[in-house]
Structure formats: C-alpha cells, structure tokens
Amino acid sequence: MSGGYSNGFALLVVLFILLIIVGAAYIY
C-alpha cells in the first residue's frame, strides 16, 4: 500500500520536474 503511494508520488514528481525543464527550454 505504502509502496504504491510512494511510486505514484515519485512519478508525479518526475512529471513535474520534466514540465519545468521543458518550460525552461521553451522560454530560453
């Protein structure tokens, strides 16, 4: 149960970081 929650949270963090990187690359 905790493992699935941790996995989902990690995926959310990765997607968020990816969005920031893509956004920065688009701005610059």
Curated annotation (Swiss-Prot):
Entry membrane topology: Single-pass membrane protein
Keyword line: Germination, Membrane, Sporulation, Transmembrane, Transmembrane helix
Induction (free text): Expression is regulated by the mother cell-specific transcription factors sigma K and GerE.
Gene Ontology annotations of biological process type: sporulation resulting in formation of a cellular spore
TM helices/strands, residue ranges: 8-28
GO CC annotations, alphabetized: membrane
UniProt key word Isomerase: no
InterPro entries: YjcZ-like
Location of the protein in the cell: Spore coat; Membrane
Inactivation phenotype: Spores of the null mutant show partial lack of assembly of several coat components, including CotB, CotG and CotH, and impairment of response during germination.
Main location: other
Pfam family name, one: YjcZ_2
Family, similarity comment: Belongs to the SscA family.
Function of the protein: Spore protein involved in the assembly of several components of the spore coat, including CotB, CotG and CotH, and in spore germination.
Protein name per Swiss-Prot or TrEMBL: Small spore coat assembly protein A
Organism per entry: Bacillus subtilis (strain 168)
Source species taxonomy: Bacteria, Bacillati, Bacillota, Bacilli, Bacillales
